[in-house]
Amino acid sequence: TAEYNQLKVLKGMQDNKVSDIHFAATTGYGYNDLGRDTLEDVYASVFHAESALVRPQLISGTHALHIALSGNLRPGDELLSPVGKPYDTLEEVIGIRDSVGSLKEYGVSYRQVDLLPDGTFDYENIAKAINEKTKLVTIQRSKGYDPRPTFSVKQIGELIAFVKKIKPEVICMVDNCYGEFVETIEPTDVGADMIVGSLIKNPGGGLAPIGGYIAG
């Protein structure tokens, strides 16, 4: 798996013709920053996505998730988590805990379906939870602080297929933190419209002190 993913990243760099020029400093306002733009093209290639946003200004995975959610949800929309409660750090983003600037404050409602006792998806109640207001379904790949197992890409693909069968136009976003490069495929290979992650974790190789990405 490690060798496969190493080759996949190298191919992404080769396909986008990464060279020494991409590591040169730029001046001005950062317009037409060749290094930055090419890095984002590499991420899009590696994750088999149409495009990607990769920036140090996305200071963490939580920040990247906040941007992704805020960019796709509007007042009156509903966010659904079919895998139970997300990370504690997202509670204030969503509005589970009251916070200034939360999605709830801007009129975005939230609904969640807890996992079954054996840690599998509760498909029956997920189907009931999807309604005309459901705009985005967020799937947290990592178990986080919960005792449940981390989901495989295959499991995520099955869940996405189930959701899309009920409501094809719904946006399926995967919180990919801690999940990058641990399998030979990523959620974008099995139907995810968007994946979000942190450069502090797997993509940064333990070296990046900051950064995040959104690809879809």
Predicted region positions:
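Glycine-rich phosphate-binding segment of PLP-dependent enzymes
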Residues: T1-A49
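Short loop-beta-helix segment that forms the pyridoxal 5′-phosphate
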Residues: A44-A68
